[in-house]
Curated annotation (Swiss-Prot):
SMART domains from the UniProt entry: IG, IGv
Start and end residues of each stretch annotated as Complementarity-determining-3: 110-117
Subunit structure: Immunoglobulins are composed of two identical heavy chains and two identical light chains; disulfide-linked.
Region (Complementarity-determining-1): 45-53
Region named Complementarity-determining-2: 71-73
UniProt-listed SUPFAM superfamilies: Immunoglobulin
Name the record gives this protein: Immunoglobulin lambda variable 7-43
Organism: Homo sapiens
Length: 117
């Protein structure tokens, strides 16, 4: 069986109360099915902490965004076990372990700057 690369697109979706804030994600990543990949989300204001309540969303073509992770590492009941959220090196991180073909999508992070301390 041939392995088909998956393309994971990451877009910034993090408007906050401070118009000068910039949130950065990898523009795109490629991973083979069964592999593991970590997507990150950084803030120009400094290290991302749990006080930013990092959220992660997945959007597939023609569909509305679907929430995956909230408050850094909490999963919704519909979030597959292979998705996990964490803080890594001052960034919010989303890790996919055992990537499946259906994981090909755009992934967004959302940070709440009003709650950051």
């Amino acid at each position: 069986m041939a392995w088909t690369p998956l393309f994971l697109f990451l877009l910034t979706c993090c408007p906050g109360s401070n118009s000068q804030t910039v949130v950065t994600q990898e523009p795109s990543l490629t991973v083979s099915p069964g592999g593991t990949v970590t997507l990150t989300c950084a803030s120009s204001t400094g290290a991302v902490t749990s006080g930013y309540y990092p959220n992660w969303f997945q959007q597939k073509p023609g569909q509305a965004p679907r929430a995956l992770i909230y408050s850094t590492s909490n999963k919704h009941s519909w979030t597959p076990a292979r998705f996990s959220g964490s803080l890594l090196g001052g960034k919010a991180a989303l890790t996919l372990s055992g990537v499946q073909p259906e994981d090909e999508a755009e992934y967004y992070c959302l940070l709440y700057y009003g709650g950051a301390q």
